[in-house]
Amino acid sequence: MNNNNENDPVRLLEMSRRKLLMGAASLAGAGAVAGLFPTLLWARTTLTFSNSFRSLTNPYHATFNRGGETYAASQQLPYSPLVTEGNSQKGIADIRALIAKTDGNLVLNVEPNDSADARVIIEQCVKAGVYVTTIWNKPDDMHPWDYSPYWVAHIAEDGEAVGEAVATELFEAMGGKGGIVALGGIFSNVASIGRRSGLDAALKKYPDIKLLDFQAADWSANKAFPIVQSWLTRFGSEIKGIWCANDDMGMGALEALRGEGLAGAIPVVGIDAIEQAVEAIRTGEYIATSSLDPYWLGSMGLALAHAAKTGRLDPAKEPHEHREFYVRPQLITKNNVEAFYASSVKATPAVDVTDFWGRVAGPIRYNS
């Protein structure tokens, strides 16, 4: 038998198989083998959206996540949330892994666990060509315009103004005098530092208010609860009010008060306007909170980076106040709580993702 016979069916099958593989390999860059290897090429051909944030158990971040989910669904593209659980190394590693998984075909909206984390995250994104928006935390010496076009924007709060506003509501509810205790977030977080500065500013304006103690509860209701229990034992009737740097800690404080039958008797304030805090204002157990609209942040952070990636927005042509800015807050008290509840708690918040600058409250100010 002649094994060199050109009509040998076995030889023809082998030649056809080789030609198919060679042809597929030569066209791989153009995506011609997508039908042969759909799983391998999914990341390259499909844009992915991702929000990176602290925790799904925190009501604020759960709402932030829903904002991201809604934006991705509106674009009919996949959404892959990343939860740091307050661990900087995990947050950075998860972003690095998602960049690799998507081959950089990614739009990212990140709340860095700590300010220092932002530097590593931004450098990773720039290297991979990933468009990114950051929320709250970054070093003061880093600016989006130095990393154009990939670092699209940084959104922050005027923490001092927000912290002072809720403190003022608390002090007025106390009649302008008496002792308070205060719960802070993570000491190195920009929001925590700013909000504490706001409390200090309010204390200077109300000389008859005495700060009995200040402790960090790391934004957590679970950590706030035993701290407030201890304060109630230590200070007793000296406590006339409780200031909290966020509402999750405020809910921990409120639970401690409920356990002693003091809910509603000792006024409490916080920040973030989570649903439980809004409900507590309605019942009179909570005095005030401030909304920074995490649903909007979760949506708009992705919308900004997506617009830059698709060419609808050129970050390099935008003024600095569109690259780093404070978001406009809303103070919630008994006077407007029902309207806020109807529009932002009972109903899904309305977000115009084409109005990039509608909630800009001004450029970020630095102390140094």
Please give the residue ranges for each predicted region.
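Hinge/cleft segment of the Venus flytrap/periplasmic-binding protein
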Residues: 45, 183, 187, 202, ...
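Beta-alpha junction/loop-to-helix N-cap segments that form part of ligand/metal-binding clefts
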Residues: 85, 90-142, 157, 248-250
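Flexible loop/hinge segments that line or gate small-molecule binding clefts
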Residues: 121-161, 179, 274-282, 286-287
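Hydrophobic alpha-helical
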Residues: 108-130, 199, 212-213, 217-280, ...
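Hydrophobic alpha-helical segments within soluble ligand-binding/sensing domains
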Residues: 91, 153-180, 224, 273, ...
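Extracytoplasmic "Venus flytrap"
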Residues: 48-67, 71, 75, 79-94, ...
